[in-house]
Amino acid sequence: MTTTMNRLPVSTWNPLGVNYAPASAALPAVPAAGWAKAEALSPALPAGVTAPAAADFGSFAASGMGAETDAWLAANANLVNHLAVTGTADAPVVFETALDTDHPHALTYLTIDAAAGSSLTVVQVVRGDAEDGISANLTRIRAAEGAHVVLVQVQLLGNRARRWNAVAIEQGTSARVEQVRIELGGSVVACGARTLLNHNKCEYDLDAVYFGHSNDVLDFNDVSVHTGRDTLCEMHTAGVLTGSADKILRGTVDFQRGAKRGVGHESEDVLLFSPSARNRTAPLILCGEEEVEGQHAASVGRLDENKLYYLRSRGLSEAQARRLMVDARFAPAIDKIPLDSLQDEVRENVARRLNDELDG
């Protein structure tokens, strides 16, 4: 499908090619026979959490991927889940999907309605490497006054699958939403998160990591819109690019009029393992209010040969030294995964990808 996704809120010089996602990241065409049935494990629901048959999110804010992409994802979903939480959930709700020969398509739509003062952690995991596999996800979060929602997304696809991941968030007064986004596989990865901090003292945290290799195309667009007073946003991303991977990250902190004493920080730390890898970063801070604090930072570099030599002189192999450097960058996000076994799986996946690059 041809649509403009991951659009930068304010366009920059067009020849840079960062104003929106490239054509190579376009949404997939709907198969003539329709989408294959998805396979998923039904999650256990802790006390205070229910799964209603329907939810009213029809006029919800757009994700970072854009309203048109959101509409397509919702209309084409072959797995739909709604969660409502009214208390403090004592265990995470875990959604697991797998792409395989019989189930190559997982198009998921999840809504989370967190009532005032409630607390919930949701984990979304997708695995598999079906031929022409498709993983497409739309998650919408409504966090009422004082609610706390943690969304952990872990993507462990193989190299033949493609991935789209949209997140839209609306927050009430003093609400807090934390998002962890780990994207390690897929030949095409396009993600966009957008949160509306339109009430006083609400907070949003994003910790994201990605791994691009071979000819992967990675495209990200993360936006925090501040209209309430005393709002806080922290968006931090770490990535590794190898082979001829091509990555664009747009990170926007938008302070609109009335967002007094708003604070927004965004940063990216990219490690390049190949001279053929292409990295583009478009940090953007928009100020419609004077009394705000906005900061952005981007660090792009290659392996420090002195550090590598030091680690190898202490008995580490080159693969172990590289893994240590990557682990240090990825740890803030991985450590937030509430399941120890999933943390281990993510670290093993990263180590395997690094080893494959060295062997290649």
Question: PLM ranges: what are they?
Answer:
Residues 19, 56-59, 309:
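Intrinsically disordered, low-complexity N-terminal regions enriched in serine/proline/glycine
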Residues 1-40:
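Short, Gly/Pro- and small/polar-rich lid/capping loops
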Residues 6, 47, 71-74:
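Polar/charged alpha-helical tracts
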Residues 61-309, 313-316, 330, 334-360:
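Conserved beta-strand/loop scaffold segments within soluble protein domains that form the structured core
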